[in-house]
Amino acid sequence: MKGFNCNGQVILISGGSQGLGESFAKRFVQDDDGPGSNTNKVIIVSRSQSKLVKACERIGVDGVSLDRYVNDTNRNETKLIYHSCDTSSYDKVALMFKLLVKSELVPSQVYMCAGGSIPKLFLDLTPEELQNGITTNYSTAVNLAHVSLKHDVPHLLFFSSEVAFFPFIGYAQYAPLKQSIRSLVAILRQEHSSTRITCVYPGNFQSEGFDLENITKPAITKEIEGPSNPVTAAQCRDKIISSLKWGLDDITTDSIGWLLMACDQGLNKHSTSQFMFVFSWILGALLNITIVPIYMLICKFQIYQWKRNKDTK
């Protein structure tokens, strides 16, 4: 079990201008034990410079751009650094790390929070939305992971989704890429066993992205999902940090996510560190024999009814 320390770290967060990424940044720059108790350096990354500046204002700490930090003579006072970078471009990620090395800011933890979903039926998606799903949800993570490992970053944190365990209608632009993240994590754990590699599967949490998703989400998708009571981004973040401190590296943030993960073990998934692993493996086997087949028949019937109602309109 590899330890987890929230202090004295250099932490890079992609997708740090909003949502869960911003919440992590806010947590990691706080002086919980009095002024000066926190010695973290936090770098938030996003494509939009203006969003990063606004995020710094919401976090409540004076942020400094990475370009300015490189030439800053009073670096010890700086906790929060921001940098505009399109992490879907490998060259731009590599260039960012050159600046980090020059600034003596090689990360000890990298949080790959960038991502987003546009829930629609497959044929309703535009070519741009399809490509955006690939670049935002996979390319951003694979580029950042590749460059991070080249610089011997000791802890990588990937962010997948509960739909990686159970992809269903309406998530064609999102779920396949989040499943790809899970596959990538399994391979990297084999190739880089000395590196701590965490994969988080968050449930719904309140964010700008969550509100936008509900605008385009098909009715059948909402029906299968059922009613949702999203937690705050801070609650989701604290659950993840608590799990990390326990040494867990396959992390869900609610009971539904844990049950879905229990039902989807399979090859390369038995050496992972998850909550109540042995019990989840047994429970998952029982659910796959009993409950899952019945539930999938119900889903099939829901989709059939939805299609029939749609055709009669």
Curated annotation (Swiss-Prot):
UniProt topology in membrane: Single-pass membrane protein
Subcellular localization, as worded in the UniProt entry: Endoplasmic reticulum membrane
Gene Ontology molecular function: 3-dehydrosphinganine reductase activity; NADPH binding
Biological process according to GO: 3-keto-sphinganine metabolic process; sphingolipid biosynthetic process
Motif GXSXG, residue range(s) on this chain: 15-19
Disulfide cysteine pairs (residue numbers): none
List of catalytic residues: 160 (proton donor), 174 (proton acceptor), 178 (lowers pka of active site tyr)
Catalysed reaction equations from the record: sphinganine + NADP(+) = 3-oxosphinganine + NADPH + H(+)
Enzyme Commission no: 1.1.1.102
SUPFAM superfamilies: NAD(P)-binding Rossmann-fold domains
Major subcellular location class: endoplasmic reticulum
Cellular component annotations (GO), alphabetically ordered: endoplasmic reticulum membrane
Record-annotated membrane-spanning stretches: 278-298
Positions bound to NADP(+): 12, 20, 86, 174, 178, 207
Sequence similarity: Belongs to the short-chain dehydrogenases/reductases (SDR) family.
Official protein name in the record: 3-ketodihydrosphingosine reductase TSC10
Organism: Kluyveromyces lactis (strain ATCC 8585 / CBS 2359 / DSM 70799 / NBRC 1267 / NRRL Y-1140 / WM37)
Gene assigned in the entry: TSC10
